A protein has these predicted regions:
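Consensus positions within tandem repeat domains that build extended binding/scaffold surfaces
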Residues: 87-89, 108-111, 131-133, 154-157, ...
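Extracellular/surface recognition and adhesion modules
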Residues: 8, 41-43, 64-66, 78, ...
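Short, aromatic/basic amphipathic alpha-helical patches
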Residues: 321-324, 341-353
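Structural signature of tandem-repeat unit edges
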Residues: 60, 70-84, 93-106, 115-128, ...
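Exposed beta-strand and adjacent loop surfaces of beta-rich binding modules
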Residues: 3-7, 38-40, 330
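Serine/threonine-rich, repeat-prone extracellular segments and beta-strand-based repeat modules
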Residues: 16-52
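Solvent-exposed, low-complexity, repeat-rich "mucin-like" stalks and linkers
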Residues: 1-18
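Interdomain boundary/hinge segments at the C-termini of tandem beta-sandwich modules
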Residues: 54-58
């Protein structure tokens, strides 16, 4: 037992009180073999005894780091002294519930990897997560991170997890690669307004049905929402605008989403990548915001799009000699009044001359 922090004061016959140093040998009744809420221990000094209660936690903490977790416990509440949870601390454990303490700042790589965790309570003090924390946590149904101070959701945070609901904090700026890969039970998610980046395959093959994107987002990486079979709607919200000339939705971002019927492009996006909506036949209408300055090869070909509204006065640039920007059977491309001739003479757009008119 470590008696650091135990302060004992003795009252002597002369009426004075003095600090008394206590050694482990003078303590009885203590056992750390099992966690208990209250354990009575007794100090014996020169024939005098004093008893008091202590709580035995199922964890060991050294210098603020969780160093050991006793096995065989379904629920654990971490003591307030824990500042960080190290790599693989609960990996493969049979624990069902963990209450993370206020004061906890970071959680290490694979901390709960392949565990049976069902419920976890996150503190307001949490600032940093490392990768793969809830990888293969099939029993985890909800993760409420909304009160934390996280700015980044790391790569592979919830890969193959059973999460049905994830609430993200307003402080979040980045969702890293494959953060929600194959989360088949996740149905909806709202991306916080401060998020600027969604990483490679972040939501690939997830079960989401609707997504709300902030208008200030500047990077949606390749295959971010690739093959989401239940995705029906992607909408935008917010007044934040970022004037980043490289802001881009990258290639194949929404390819293979057969139920997608509505897609809104965030206002800050400047470049639309190759094969952006490939294979999506339910979408029939699309609006391209005025900030879009470039549309890459076959961005909207192989889709069900029939009507397009392009809000830019200047035609978005096309660099390919053979563009395949829209389906051959598109019925109309509406552009601003006074810009019809610009579009009809612009590279790529001239392939659709007889479809271009004003809105």
């Amino acid at each position: 037992i470590d008696l650091t922090g135990l302060n004992v004061t003795g009252k002597y016959d002369d009426g004075k009180q003095r600090p008394v140093k206590v050694s482990p040998e003078q303590l009885s009744g203590f056992s750390s073999s099992a966690p208990v809420e209250k354990q009575e221990v007794t100090i014996t000094i020169e024939g005098k005894q004093k008893s008091f209660s202590v709580q035995i936690s199922p964890v060991r903490v050294e210098n603020g780091v969780l160093t050991e977790v006793l096995k065989g416990h379904n629920e654990i509440t971490l003591p307030n002294s824990v500042k960080s949870i190290p790599k693989a601390a609960f990996r493969g454990s049979q624990i069902n519930k963990v209450v993370l303490n206020e004061g906890l700042q970071s959680i290490g790589d694979m901390a709960f990897f392949n565990s049976t965790i069902q419920e976890i309570v996150f503190p307001t003090t949490l600032e940093q997560l490392e990768e793969n924390i809830f990888y293969y946590c099939r029993n985890l149904k909800k993760a409420d991170l909304s009160r934390t101070k996280l700015t980044k959701l790391p790569a592979s945070t919830f890969v193959y997890a059973g999460v049905e609901e994830v609430l993200l904090p307003v402080t979040l700026k980045e969702i890293d690669a494959q953060a929600f890969l194959n989360t088949s039970q996740l149905k909806t998610i709202e991306i916080p307004e401060n998020v600027r980046t969604i990483g490679l395959e972040a939501f690939r093959e997830s079960g989401i049905t609707t997504v709300k994107l902030p208008n200030g987002i500047t990077t949606i990486a390749q295959r971010a929402f690739y093959y989401c079979p239940e995705l029906t709607e992607v909408t935008t919200y917010g007044t934040v605008f970022n004037d980043d000339p490289e802001a881009m939705i990258h290639a194949y971002c929404l390819e293979g989403c057969p139920k997608l019927a509505h897609f809104e492009i965030p206002k800050s996006i400047r470049i639309l990548g190759q094969g952006l909506l490939g294979g999506n036949r339910k979408m029939t209408q699309l609006t391209i915001p005025s900030n879009v300055a470039q549309i890459n090869f076959s961005a909207f070909n192989n889709t069900g799009i029939k009507e397009v509204k392009v809000e830019g006065i200047t035609p978005p640039q096309v660099f390919e000699k053979i563009w395949y920007g829209f389906p051959d059977d598109i019925t109309v491309i509406r552009v601003p009044a006074g810009s019809v001739e610009k579009y009809k003479n612009a590279n790529g757009w001239r392939d659709f001359t007889n479809k271009i008119t004003t809105f």
